[in-house]
């Protein structure tokens, strides 16, 4: 066959058909075009024949030698009409996969379409104009039929949603990516024993099968069948029911344990830091005043009383004036024993003589010796010239 040259020729041929139809007188318009069906269905990938033929009123059914037919087939898709075949002056032109069933000239104008696709669905129009040898038109007619190309289901995909362990709920899903018309689904269990499922567990439109409260007896091979008017496709999934805890339960327990340990470690660390923060202010030493100097004093192994010494020191501090320099003439304190009588300090003389030194400690023990023996120094209050203690 000769391929169609383009839309320009299509328009010219259509104009020619209209012109020939206008030339035919009404009384001579005896041609009748026959299409037995208004709608046809075919399967994608196959072929279909669009039946069409014409008759002349008062003539035999077979074509006559004087008949000169002009035939054109059009396909309209998305508001655009396209010519798929034409037979004019003994020459046939067509698109790939399109042909006439019978050789021309013939009154049978049936059109064959091969290698069908879904996009070939739509209205097809057949137009015929018959002339005699003198070029006079014997009639013209045009009719249309609808072609619907069906698509069998594409192989579906089966999936298992959920964790199949005893007592759990799972869903088996099945989905076919392409079909025309829409498919319906059916789930069956093949092994170890055959079982067919129905609603409400089965959704025939969405292809889902809900299995609740799983048990070991529900394990097996499940087959999903996707079917429509022109075909069937299937897939399967194997369901194995676990009797132990599910993987999700184990994972949740592990994650919960790790989170608990992390929180416990955080609390311990926080408590430890708070304890250190409370200890640091307590250990700080604040120096408000300078401590008094401690004078060395002799020690005694048998005659020194520590309690009396501490009392003497306390009394001396209480009698000391809080402020001001020491008064003139005050005696310098010397270490002494609390168990012995203190000698009365002498008043300074007016003749300029130096005051007599304090008599040494009885017993012949020096102050250094007393210090080595563990004696505690005692502050002796000074006496003023008036005789009062300072």
From Swiss-Prot:
Residues 153-242 form the Ig-like C2-type domain. It is linked to Neurodevelopmental disorder with intracranial hemorrhage, seizures, and spasticity: An autosomal recessive disease characterized by prenatal or neonatal onset of intracranial hemorrhage, ventriculomegaly and cerebral calcifications. Affected individuals have profound global developmental delay, intellectual disability, epilepsy, absent or severely delayed speech, and varying degrees of spasticity. Death in utero or in early childhood may occur. The keyword Oxidoreductase does not apply. Residues 30-143 form the Ig-like V-type domain. Disulfide bonds join 174-224. It comes from the Eukaryota. Interacts with MAGI1. GO terms for cellular component: adherens junction; bicellular tight junction; cell-cell junction; plasma membrane; protein-containing complex. Highly expressed in endothelial cells. The modification Phosphothreonine is found at residues 332, 334. Residues 316-368 are annotated as: Disordered. InterPro entries: ESAM (IPR042757), Ig-like_dom (IPR007110), Ig-like_dom_sf (IPR036179), Ig-like_fold (IPR013783), Ig_sub (IPR003599), Ig_sub2 (IPR003598), Ig_V-set (IPR013106). It is found in: Cell junction, Adherens junction; Cell junction, Tight junction; Cell membrane. Can mediate aggregation most likely through a homophilic molecular interaction. It comes from Homo sapiens (Human). Residues 1-29 form the signal peptide. This is Endothelial cell-selective adhesion molecule. Residues 333-342 have a biased composition (Polar residues). Keywords: Cell adhesion, Cell junction, Cell membrane, Disease variant, Disulfide bond, Glycoprotein, Immunoglobulin domain, Intellectual disability, Membrane, Phosphoprotein, Repeat, Signal, Tight junction, Transmembrane, Transmembrane helix. PANTHER family: ENDOTHELIAL CELL-SELECTIVE ADHESION MOLECULE. Residues 270-390 are cytoplasmic. It holds the Pfam family Ig_3. SUPFAM superfamilies: Immunoglobulin (SSF48726). The modification Phosphoserine is found at residues 301, 336, 339, 344, 371. It is a single-pass type I membrane protein. GO terms for biological process: bicellular tight junction assembly; cell-cell adhesion; homophilic cell adhesion via plasma membrane adhesion molecules; maintenance of blood-brain barrier; protein localization; regulation of actin cytoskeleton organization; regulation of actin filament polymerization.
């Amino acid at each position: 066959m000769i391929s169609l040259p383009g839309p320009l020729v299509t328009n010219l041929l259509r104009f020619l058909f209209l012109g020939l139809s206008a030339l035919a007188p009404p009384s001579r318009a005896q041609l009748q075009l026959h299409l037995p069906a208004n709608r046809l269905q075919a399967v994608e990938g196959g072929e279909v024949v669009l039946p069409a033929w014409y008759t002349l009123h008062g003539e035999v059914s077979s074509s006559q030698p004087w008949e000169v037919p002009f035939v054109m087939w059009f396909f309209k898709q998305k508001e655009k009409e396209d010519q798929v075949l034409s037979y004019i002056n003994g020459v046939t032109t067509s698109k790939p996969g399109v042909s006439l069933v019978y050789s021309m000239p013939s009154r049978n104008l049936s059109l064959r379409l091969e290698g069908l696709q879904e996009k070939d669905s739509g209205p097809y129009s057949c137009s015929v104009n018959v002339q005699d040898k003198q070029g006079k038109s014997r009639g013209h007619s045009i009719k249309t039929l609808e072609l619907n190309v069906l698509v069998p289901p594409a192989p579906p995909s089966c999936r298992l949603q959920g964790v199949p362990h005893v007592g759990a709920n799972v869903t088996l899903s099945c989905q076919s990516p392409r079909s025309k018309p829409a498919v319906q689904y059916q789930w069956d269990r093949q092994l170890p024993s055959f079982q067919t499922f129905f609603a409400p567990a089965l959704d025939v439109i969405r292809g889902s099968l809900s299995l609740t409260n799983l048990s070991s007896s529900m394990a097996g091979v499940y087959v999903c069948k996707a079917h429509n008017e022109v075909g069937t496709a299937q897939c399967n999934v194997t369901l194995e029911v676990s009797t132990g805890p599910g993987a999700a339960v184990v994972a949740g327990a592990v994650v919960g344990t790790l989170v608990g340990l992390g929180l416990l470690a955080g609390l311990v660390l926080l408590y430890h830091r708070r304890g250190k923060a409370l200890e640091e202010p307590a250990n700080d030493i604040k120096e408000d005043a300078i401590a008094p100097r401690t004078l060395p004093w002799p020690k005694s192994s048998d005659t020194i009383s520590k309690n009396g010494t501490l009392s003497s020191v306390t009394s001396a501090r209480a009698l000391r004036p809080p402020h001001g320099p020491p008064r003139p003439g005050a005696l310098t304190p010397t270490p002494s024993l609390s168990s012995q009588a203190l000698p009365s300090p002498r008043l300074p003389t007016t003749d300029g003589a130096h005051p007599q030194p304090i008599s040494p400690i009885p017993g012949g023990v020096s102050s250094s010796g007393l210090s080595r023996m563990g004696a505690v120094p005692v502050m002796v209050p000074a006496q003023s010239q008036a005789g009062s203690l300072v």
